[in-house]
Amino acid sequence: MQEFLQEAKNSSRIIANLGSAQKNRVLNEMADALIEHSSFILSHNQKDMNDAKLNNLNDALQDRLLLTEKRIQDMAIAIRQIASQQDPLGKILNGWVTKDGLNIQKVSIPIGVIGIIYESRPNVTSDTAALCFKSGNVCVLKGGKEAENSNKAIATILREVLRKNNLPEYAISLLPDSSREGVAKLIKQDKYVDLIVPRGGEALIRFVSENSSIPVIKHDKGICHIFIDQDANITKIFDIVVNAKCQKPSACNSIETLLIHTNIAALILSGLVETLSLHGTILKGCPETLQHINAIPATLEDFDTEYLANVLNIKIVANVDEAITHIQRHGSGHSESILSENYTTINKFLSEVDAACVYANASTRFTDGGEFGLGAEVGISTNKLHSRGPMGIEDLTTFKYKIYGQGQIRKG
């Protein structure tokens, strides 16, 4: 593995110093190549889908794994959007002159070699490769075993574009050892790798966080909530809740729990249940909720569960403070939303809820690099340091200080 990672590290100097025009041209060629070779990708994806069925992978995971012509087109569009963005490198973030006449500039630079560990979704391969390339970074990708054929096909196409442009193919690499042991070895290679970004299940995140000797930015689970305040606009509630839960239940930005102010619960619960039942949502409720509707009794464990399925907890709360306390206790710091027309309550919620993304009168489903206008994302960071929320190209940079002098020496 060391030889492989040394090649990746050697590539980083070349990639870090590419000009914006060259990077954008190569990215657009990558997008073209994905479309041109879509049948090649789909044939390899079919192998993964066949294996998924044989291994009884659940429907949510199979949906994440599936590629179609439309999804490949979306992958290409995401790469073009990344290419169209402003280059994040070489920006003067700050500058000043010291009392000794030193001209100091704080300038954005690439992080270096980034290891990205992910599961199921093959589009992550092209998204993260493009984001890293645009931001001058080299990526070492470790996808899930269930998507091995798809990931290899996509990486092969992207690497061929690099080769045709006389650029090092190791700038986009799949980890040769895709086993758990391979991951365990990768996350100890701090001599070669500068950052690890794991995105996937809770067990993967915990394993990487506890064992890595390399800095980690986590794409952790999404236990997201919507709080319906007593001053909510009833005409907005139903569409937002259905979108946040039912549009894509397997997404990390879908909600798992609905918190409802006690003063509005009786007015909206029956209508909500009727609407959600039309979408096949399984409901679990707290004792007070069960006084209004028929639902499965919710346990304490349910409020700590990321279902990744069309299941929704409902809890009635006394006020916004109880809602915030519940989110603080059970949320994962991902995305939280309040539905209200009361500015004071909204401001309190947005200020006091500790999460990467906090919304007022909108669905949590917008927590996404594409929806934020970032083109794509490496992940949705639930960390508080370096990066938080959807990680676009700006979040894949660090900085250095450039100091210009005229012969100054330090005295004293």
Curated annotation (Swiss-Prot):
Pathway: Amino-acid biosynthesis; L-proline biosynthesis; L-glutamate 5-semialdehyde from L-glutamate: step 2/2
One BP annotation, GO: L-proline biosynthetic process
Any one GO cellular component localisation term in the record: cytoplasm
MF (Gene Ontology): glutamate-5-semialdehyde dehydrogenase activity; NADP binding
Keyword terms, alphabetized: Amino-acid biosynthesis, Cytoplasm, NADP, Oxidoreductase, Proline biosynthesis
EC code: 1.2.1.41
Localisation per UniProt entry: Cytoplasm
Record field: catalytic activity: L-glutamate 5-semialdehyde + phosphate + NADP(+) = L-glutamyl 5-phosphate + NADPH + H(+)
Family membership: Belongs to the gamma-glutamyl phosphate reductase family.
HAMAP family associated with the record: ProA
Function comment: Catalyzes the NADPH-dependent reduction of L-glutamate 5-phosphate into L-glutamate 5-semialdehyde and phosphate. The product spontaneously undergoes cyclization to form 1-pyrroline-5-carboxylate.
Protein name: Gamma-glutamyl phosphate reductase
The organism of origin for this protein: Aliarcobacter butzleri (strain RM4018)
Lineage of the species this protein comes from: Bacteria, Pseudomonadati, Campylobacterota, Epsilonproteobacteria, Campylobacterales
